[in-house]
C-alpha cells in the first residue's frame, strides 16, 4: 500500500489532467491485488471477483474527479468494491432458487477452483464463512483475512468500532459452532 507521502504525490498527480492516467495506473498497480482478495473472500468464483475488480476500478476512474482526498485512496476503493460486491450478491441472491443449491454450488465451485489450494478443513472453514450474513461476512473477512484494524474497517463501512467487534465476535462463534457440528 502507498504510504502517506506517496499517496499525496498520487493525489496531486490525479488533479493534473496530463498525469492522471499514470497516477491511476499506479493506483491500480498498488491496490488491485488487495481489492481482488477482498472481493474474492465475498464471492465464490475467480471470474466474478475479476469482473468486480474491473467494475471497482471503472467506477473509481469515472468518479476520480469527485474524490476530494478526505480519506485514503484505499478506503475509497474498498468502499467502491464493497458497494459493487454487495450489489452483485443481492442480484445473485434474487436469482438463486434455493439455499441447498447455493451450498452445493459453493462446494462444487471451491473444490474445482484452480486458484483455491486448501484442504478439506479449509473448505469447511470457507463453507462456514459463507453461511454468515453478508455484513457479518464482510467484517469477518476484513478482520481475519485482511488483518485490518477495527479503525480502518469502521472508516470503510461507516460503522462504530463497538458494533464491528460485536459482529466479528458473533461471526467467530457461528463459524466455531458450524465446524464443531461437522466433526
Please annotate each region the language model reported.
Residues 1-34, 181:
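N-terminal module of bacterial RNA polymerase sigma factors
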Residues 66-68, 79-99, 170:
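Arg/Lys-rich amphipathic alpha helix in sigma70-family domain 2
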Residues 139-143:
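A short pre-motif secondary-structure segment
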Residues 51-58, 71-83:
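Structural recognition of an alpha-helix C-terminal capping motif at a helix-to-coil junction
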Residues 3-9, 95-118:
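Internal acidic/polar
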Residues 44, 57-72, 92:
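Sigma70-family region 2
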Residues 75, 86, 136, 155-182:
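DNA-recognition helix of helix-turn-helix
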Amino acid at each position: 500500500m502507498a504510504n502517506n507521502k506517496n499517496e499525496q504525490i498520487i493525489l496531486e498527480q490525479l488533479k493534473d489532467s496530463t498525469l492522471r492516467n499514470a497516477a491511476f495506473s499506479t493506483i491500480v498497480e498498488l491496490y488491485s491485488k488487495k481489492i481482488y482478495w477482498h472481493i474474492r473472500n465475498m464471492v465464490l468464483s475467480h471470474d466474478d471477483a475479476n469482473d468486480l475488480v474491473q467494475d471497482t476500478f471503472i467506477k473509481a476512474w469515472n468518479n476520480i474527479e469527485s474524490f476530494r482526498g478526505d480519506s485514503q485512496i484505499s478506503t475509497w476503493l474498498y468502499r467502491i468494491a464493497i458497494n459493487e460486491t454487495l450489489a452483485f450478491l443481492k442480484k445473485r441472491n434474487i436469482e438463486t432458487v434455493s439455499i441447498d443449491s447455493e451450498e452445493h454450488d459453493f462446494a462444487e465451485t471451491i473444490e474445482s477452483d484452480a486458484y483455491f489450494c486448501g484442504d478439506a478443513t479449509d473448505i469447511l472453514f470457507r463453507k462456514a464463512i459463507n453461511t454468515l450474513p453478508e455484513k457479518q461476512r464482510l467484517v469477518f473477512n476484513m478482520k481475519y483475512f485482511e488483518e485490518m484494524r477495527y479503525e480502518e474497517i469502521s472508516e470503510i463501512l461507516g460503522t462504530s468500532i463497538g458494533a464491528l467487534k460485536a459482529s466479528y465476535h458473533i461471526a467467530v462463534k457461528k463459524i466455531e459452532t458450524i465446524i464443531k457440528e461437522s466433526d
